[in-house]
Amino acid sequence: MAVRKGHHRAYNIHYHIVFPIKYRKVLLNEPTVATLKTITYDIQDRYELEIEQLGADRDHIHLLCSAHPKYAPGQLVRLYKSITARELFKRHPELKKELWGGELWSDGYYVATVGEKGNWSVVERYIRDQGHKPQDVQLRLL
């Protein structure tokens, strides 16, 4: 989480973004998530983004990223949703059968800024653990 520098600027901006699948359909399996990660890192290389963590559950994804200040959070969401939807539909045509209307992502999203002094490690661990079953900690009577 170092300060990134460029011509006439220095910044340290991190976003936690959640993208739900349209209709909260359960469509994200291992091959789809692997493809999604490949597409995500291609987006990172093309745009001034740094993907710090990507976690997927069966019906939504969490993204922890650092972005150039020229991108508003809404622009990042639009960019990510459009590219990933187009590429996932190309590489996994079976997704189109599950979703009518040609849309992969729901219209809504969640975005929050993440600071290194407060909730960074909590958010990073939460995203990393997406898709894994939580360990049940059930207290039992003797």
Where are the language model's segments positioned?
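Basic nucleic-acid-binding interfaces
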Residues: M1-L142
